C-alpha cells in the first residue's frame, strides 16, 4: 500500500492493527507519533532546514518562529553571532549597534548590542513541518520516511490496546536510523564533510 498521504497512512494503520473500531483513535496515534518523531534529534536533517530574516523590537528581542525545533546558525549582516547565557547577556550595559551575542528567553531571542534598523538578522534552523491532517495531506517527513510515521503510530496503537509493540518499536528505530544515514550520505556526497553543532 502506498504511504504518501494522510488518508493512505490512516488506512495502512487500520490494516496493520486489523481493527475496525479504532477509526476515531487513529488520528491520535498519528499525532502522538509526530510529537515523538520531531522530539528526536535524528530528525534534524537537511530537508528540514529553513532560513528566515528576524525582526527585532526596540529592546533587542525577536520572536522565535512557531515551527522552530533547533538552531543551526544565527547571523547579523552575514557574521555569525555567539550564543551566551541569558544572565550573562542581561548583565551587559544597554547599548545599540551591530549585535555580537544572543541568548534565548522563553519564545524569544535577545540580542546584544540591540540591533539597529540597518542590521539584518538571519536564522538558519530546523523546523517542524505542519502536522498531517485531512486538510494537510502530506509533509516532507512523510515523503522522506513514511515507515517512521507508520511504525511510530503503530507503537502508539499498541500502547492504547495494551499490546506488545516491540516489533513496531524496532521498525520505528530502524526507520529513524536509516533516515539519518541517508541524510548524512546525501549531505556529504561529493564534498568534504563539515559537521555543525546545533543548539535548541
What are these model-predicted stretches?
Residues 1-200:
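Glycine-enriched, solvent-exposed interface loops adjoining structured elements
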Amino acid at each position: 500500500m502506498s504511504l504518501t498521504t494522510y488518508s493512505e497512512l490512516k488506512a495502512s494503520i487500520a490494516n496493520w492493527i486489523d481493527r475496525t473500531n479504532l477509526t476515531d483513535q487513529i488520528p491520535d496515534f498519528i499525532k502522538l507519533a509526530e510529537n515523538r518523531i520531531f522530539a528526536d534529534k535524528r530528525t534534524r536533517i537537511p530537508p528540514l532546514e529553513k532560513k528566515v530574516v528576524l525582526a527585532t523590537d526596540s529592546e533587542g528581542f525577536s520572536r522565535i518562529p512557531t515551527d522552530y525545533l533547533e538552531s543551526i546558525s544565527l547571523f547579523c549582516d552575514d557574521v555569525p553571532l555567539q550564543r551566551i547565557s541569558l544572565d550573562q547577556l542581561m548583565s551587559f550595559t544597554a547599548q545599540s549597534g551591530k549585535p555580537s551575542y544572543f541568548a534565548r528567553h522563553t519564545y524569544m531571542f535577545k540580542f546584544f548590542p540591540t540591533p539597529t534598523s540597518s542590521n539584518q538578522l538571519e536564522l538558519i534552523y530546523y523546523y517542524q513541518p505542519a502536522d498531517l491532517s485531512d486538510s494537510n495531506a502530506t509533509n516532507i517527513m512523510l515523503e522522506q520516511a513514511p515507515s517512521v510515521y507508520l511504525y511510530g503510530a503503530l507503537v502508539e496503537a499498541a500502547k492504547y490496546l495494551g499490546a506488545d509493540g516491540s516489533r513496531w518499536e524496532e521498525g520505528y528505530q530502524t526507520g529513524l536510523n536509516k533516515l539519518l544515514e541517508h541524510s548524512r550520505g546525501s549531505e556529504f556526497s561529493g564534498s568534504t564533510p563539515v559537521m555543525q553543532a546545533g543548539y535548541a
